Regions:
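Cleavable N-terminal signal peptides
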Residues: 9-10, 20
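Short, threonine-centered small-residue motifs that mark membrane-proximal processing/anchoring sites
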Residues: 212-230
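Bacterial N-terminal signal peptides that target proteins for export
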Residues: 1-8, 224-227
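Extracellular beta-strand-rich, repetitive "passenger/adhesive" scaffolds
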Residues: 21-137, 145-215
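N-terminal signal peptide c-region/cleavage motif recognized by signal peptidases
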Residues: 15-17
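A cross-kingdom C-terminal cell-surface attachment/processing module
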Residues: 226-245
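Cytoplasmic C-terminal tails of single-pass
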Residues: 246-252
Length: 252
């Protein structure tokens, strides 16, 4: 039996025995290939310290997914569905994959690290909060979908109020965005949701909703030569004398 089959079989046994599977780990130095198959995590966390190659396969019903330092998640042309946190402290190869961030479990999901996705979708009917790390950029090269509802907008926030996180939909990418609130998350690539309004966010949404960053350049004062400074001084002295003269006449 392969390592993946043994791992999945053990998970099934635990579920059938009435025990929740908290986490499935791919150890360091282990390499797993789905080869078009499906890994159903049944709400468990996935910890990747070795290598997981999805290929055209499917990773589904994950809670948290964590790529540890030294770990590799090669998404290939497959799909990954998760409802919890996303941590990328190792390597993520997006390929032409789709990563779906969905409702379930916690009311918020926290990102760690900076990831480049090919296609990513964030959808929530519960107003879920997605928290992105301050100072880091999540990049989307092909397509970005962000969908809340009219009743409860999905929320994009940074992990620290008043400090910005960044998202970058590259120029060739497409977007489908509706009912999203943004707080301290800047769009540094394509302007995002330019015809929408901030649905429940606190602001600092540069690059969203038609709010563009405006660069204000400092204009240095012109430098004067010594002769120019002398003339300026004489002019000021003349103005001062004229002012005193007018003041004396008015008092008289």
């Amino acid at each position: 039996m392969s390592f993946l089959k043994a791992l999945s079989f053990a998970a099934v046994l635990l579920v059938c025995a009435g025990h929740a599977v908290a986490q499935i780990t791919i150890p360091a130095a282990s390499a797993i290939q789905l080869a078009g198959g499906k890994l159903n995590l049944n709400g468990a966390d996935l910890q990747i310290s070795g290598t997981l190659s999805v290929g055209p396969g499917l990773v589904t019903n994950a809670n948290n997914i964590s790529i540890a330092a030294g770990g590799l998640l090669d998404a290939g042309s497959g799909a990954i569905n998760l409802s919890g946190n996303w941590s990328d402290l190792g390597s993520f190869i997006a390929g032409t994959s789709l990563v779906n961030f969905i409702d379930g479990g916690s009311a918020q999901a926290i990102f760690a690290g900076a990831t480049t996705f090919y296609t990513a979708s964030f959808s929530s009917t519960t107003g879920k909060n997605y928290l992105f790390p301050v100072g880091l950029t999540q990049t989307f090269t092909n397509s970005l979908t962000i969908l809340g509802t009219a009743a409860q907008g999905i929320q994009f926030r940074s992990t620290a109020a008043g400090q910005a996180a960044f998202v970058n939909l590259q120029p060739s990418g497409t977007q489908n965005i509706n009912f999203v609130g943004v707080s301290n998350v800047h769009a540094t690539g394509q302007p995002l949701a330019p015809t929408q309004t901030n649905d429940g966010g606190t602001g600092d949404a540069v690059g969203w909703f038609g709010l563009l960053a405006v660069a204000v350049a400092a204009v240095p004062a012109p430098l004067l030569s010594p002769f120019g400074l002398l003339l300026l001084g004489l002019l000021l002295m003349g103005l001062a004398r004229k002012f005193r003269s007018l003041s004396t006449r008015c008092l008289a």
